[in-house]
Amino acid sequence: TAENLQLVADGRPGGRAATAEALDLFPVLREVSGRRAGLLSGGQRQQLAIARALITRPKLLLLDEPTEGIQPSVVTEIEETVLALTRRGGLGVLLVEQHVGFAMRAAQHYYVLEAGRVTSSGEGGTAAEQTVRTALSV
C-alpha cells in the first residue's frame, strides 16, 4: 500500500507532502501500509484509489460510485472525506453516486440523468434531496 502511494508521488513536486495529506484523510491506509493493495478490503482499495488520485493534486476529482459495494462504516468515512474536500475548496468534485443523501450533501449543483437525458437539476444540499428522491422514485 505504501509503495502504491509512493509510486504516484515519486518525481512530483510536493509529492511527499501530498502523500502525507492523503494519509491524513484516510488514516486506515497508515494501518495497512505494509500490505499489498490486492489484499485490502474493497473499502480500503477504494480509499487507496482516491488517495492516489489526490496525490496528483488534481483540479477536478472524478468519483464514479465511490461507495458501491462497500460496508456502511467505510461509506461514512469516504463520505466525510469527500465532504471535507468540497468544503475546503480548490478542488472540484464530479460525483456519480447512488446514495442520494450523500450525493446531495456533497453537491453544490446536481443533475439527474435518465436514459442519457437531464430530467432534473438544481442547487445541491439536503433541501433538494426530496426533489431528487421523487425524480428517481426512491
Residue locations for each model-derived region?
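ABC-type ATPase nucleotide-binding domains, specifically the catalytic core motifs of the NBD
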Residues: 1-17, 25-30, 122
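Conserved ABC ATPase signature
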Residues: 36-40
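ABC ATPase C-loop
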Residues: 53-54
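Conserved catalytic motifs of ABC-family nucleotide-binding domains
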Residues: 57
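Catalytic Walker B motif of ABC-type/P-loop ATPase nucleotide-binding domains
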Residues: 61-65
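Helical segment within the ABC ATPase nucleotide-binding domain
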Residues: 75-89
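H-loop/switch region of ABC-family ATPase nucleotide-binding domains
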Residues: 97-98
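Conserved beta-strand-loop-alpha-helix hinge in the C-terminal portion
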Residues: 117-138
